[in-house]
């Protein structure tokens, strides 16, 4: 069992993430101040909603410097959905600067015939490299998405998995050293989500 810090900044699906991790035997500590993270082995930044209000909430709760220090120190970190997007420098959705931990930006999902926005529902993960959650050739991992914007990193090598969206492929997962982030919702992805969370937890130092 680990103590996992869940950043509580008013924009996260706190209940479902907590319930999912507690079902795996983990202890969850809600973090509104980083003094509460001292006993934690990993931090999760969840997120649902819009980019600007989320960043403003992080700014107003004075969590940004400590969050960056946590990630830069090499400790385990997981971003979920909007929690992935906030890691980048900016978003077409708003005007507030992102955390800038990752270089790149968040763009509106392109309009494609017969594809709806938001991109919503169950889709198969397509690994682009062997990573903490998936082997390169591992298929049949279907997970739940709901988003209207997607990440375009400057360094494509940090993309760990993609998802098909019509003729396009969108970023589904990012991995950069100790930082892992999912555009999909593992906590809403049934047995597959449980399996992926178990793999992440097993890699926590």
Curated annotation (Swiss-Prot):
Q: What GO MF terms are annotated?
A: glutaminase activity; imidazoleglycerol-phosphate synthase activity; lyase activity
Q: What is its EC number?
A: 4.3.2.10, 3.5.1.2
Give compartment(s): Cytoplasm
PROSITE patterns noted in UniProt: GATASE_TYPE_1 (PS51273)
Q: In which pathway does it act?
A: Amino-acid biosynthesis; L-histidine biosynthesis; L-histidine from 5-phospho-alpha-D-ribose 1-diphosphate: step 5/9
Cellular component terms per the entry's GO annotation: cytoplasm
Which catalytic reaction applies to this protein?
5-[(5-phospho-1-deoxy-D-ribulos-1-ylimino)methylamino]-1-(5-phospho-beta-D-ribosyl)imidazole-4-carboxamide + L-glutamine = D-erythro-1-(imidazol-4-yl)glycerol 3-phosphate + 5-amino-1-(5-phospho-beta-D-ribosyl)imidazole-4-carboxamide + L-glutamate + H(+); L-glutamine + H2O = L-glutamate + NH4(+)
Any idea where the Glutamine amidotransferase type-1 domain is?
3-205
Supply one GO BP term. L-histidine biosynthetic process
The coiled-coil segments of this chain are none
Which residues are catalytic?
Answer: 81 (nucleophile), 185, 187
Which CDD domains does the record cross-reference, listed alphabetically?
Answer: GATase1_IGP_Synthase (cd01748)
Signal peptide (residue range)? none
Protein keywords: Amino-acid biosynthesis, Cytoplasm, Glutamine amidotransferase, Histidine biosynthesis, Hydrolase, Lyase
Q: Domain of life, per the record?
A: Bacteria
What is this protein's function? IGPS catalyzes the conversion of PRFAR and glutamine to IGP, AICAR and glutamate. The HisH subunit catalyzes the hydrolysis of glutamine to glutamate and ammonia as part of the synthesis of IGP and AICAR. The resulting ammonia molecule is channeled to the active site of HisF.
Looking up NCBIfam families in the UniProt record yields:
IMP_synth_hisH (TIGR01855)
What binding partners and quaternary form does the record give?
A: Heterodimer of HisH and HisF.
Query: Could you identify this protein by its name?
Result: Imidazole glycerol phosphate synthase subunit HisH
Q: Which organism is it from?
A: Prochlorococcus marinus (strain MIT 9312)
Q: What is the lineage of its organism?
A: Bacteria, Bacillati, Cyanobacteriota, Cyanophyceae, Synechococcales
Q: Which gene encodes it?
A: hisH
């Amino acid at each position: 069992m680990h103590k996992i810090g869940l950043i509580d900044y008013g924009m996260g699906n706190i209940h479902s993430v907590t319930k999912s991790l507690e079902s795996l035997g983990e202890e969850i500590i809600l973090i509104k101040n980083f003094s509460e993270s001292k006993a934690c082995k990993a931090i999760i930044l969840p997120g649902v909603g819009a980019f600007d209000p989320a960043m403003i909430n992080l700014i107003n709760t004075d969590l940004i410097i400590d969050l960056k220090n946590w990630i830069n120190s090499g400790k385990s970190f997981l971003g979920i959905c909007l929690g992935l997007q906030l890691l980048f420098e900016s978003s077409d959705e708003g005007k507030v600067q992102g955390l800038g931990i990752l270089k790149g930006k968040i763009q509106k999902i392109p309009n494609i015939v017969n594809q709806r926005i938001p991109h919503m529902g169950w889709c198969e993960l397509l690994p682009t490299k062997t990573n903490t959650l998936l082997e390169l050739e591992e298929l049949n991992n279907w997970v739940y998405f709901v988003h209207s914007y997607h990440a375009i990193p400057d360094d494509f090598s940090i993309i760990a998995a993609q998802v098909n969206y019509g003729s396009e492929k969108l970023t589904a997962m990012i991995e950069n050293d100790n930082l892992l982030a999912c555009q999909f919702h593992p906590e809403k992805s049934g047995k597959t989500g449980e399996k992926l969370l178990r793999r992440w937890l097993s890699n926590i130092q």
